[in-house]
Amino acid sequence: MLSPASRGVKLAGMERSRFLQVALDAAAAAAEVIRHYYRDDIEVSLKPDQTPVTKADVESEQVIRKAITDAFPDHGFFGEETGHEGLDAEYLWLVDPIDGTRSFVRGYPFFSTQVALMHRGRIVVGVSSAPAFGQLAWAERGQGAFLDGHDCRVSVIERLEEAAVSSGNLRTLASGPRWGDWAEVVRRVARIRGYGDFYHYHLLAAGRIEAVVESDVNILDIAALSLIVEEAGGIFTDLEGQPVGLGTTSVLAANRHLYPELAALLRVPHA
């Protein structure tokens, strides 16, 4: 739970903790940096893992990190671009300033800023900001999930034959023994799409699709989104049925009616 001292900020008639307000403010500051560089002729470098990085990635993470460390100097920080400090702190911030840098570089709007707060291993605040696409989602544990200022809930569809499922990166799944299980899911459901990145989690939380499956993610990509889906009433685990943690690399997220059946089809061991 959030500490009592963190509560008490009110905006737009809603009570928000200081933790959430700082996360929202940090994401807004990053959005200003991102808009400055978006669709500009920006230099792209490659990190050691061959993923792209730009000045926009680094500068937007710097403004997020400053906002957080100014407000909470004793908290830990784990960022995609500027590294980590205090991973064993009671409170740990998880930040990806531009999740979807390839989309950003190529000038299409499917990228986002992800800011989450973990308290003793559990995500308690999550903000997902997509400044070019024009969506902002957030959640605070026990307080519900919100998309563009409106509360959101997962769908109530109960049959796979009526469900829409979105997949992200499935490279590991494709090279393993459960690829045939995924094929059975594809055969069973009404629609398969690959909305990807932040967007399919926003759709899931808003009740517009029923499930998301990914086999190749990192915690910075999905920490905030996991809480948003859970607070919207969904279930969010990895493909082993484990809750989200620093080592999470895969996702099975769905509404509560369909999660058990999807977990069985995909042979999720601890669901």
Pin down the residues of each PLM region.
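N-terminal subdomain of lithium-sensitive/metallo-dependent phosphomonoesterases centered on the IMPase/IPPase/PAP
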Residues: 2-98, 257-258, 264, 271
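Residue-level signal for inorganic ion chemistry
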Residues: 34, 57, 68, 101, ...
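Solvent-exposed alpha-helices and their adjacent loops that cap or buttress functional pockets
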Residues: 45, 85-87, 120, 138, ...
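Generic detector of well-ordered alpha-helical packing
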Residues: 58, 62, 81, 97-100, ...
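DPxDG-like acidic metal-binding loop motif
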Residues: 87-146, 161
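An extended, acidic
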Residues: 153-271
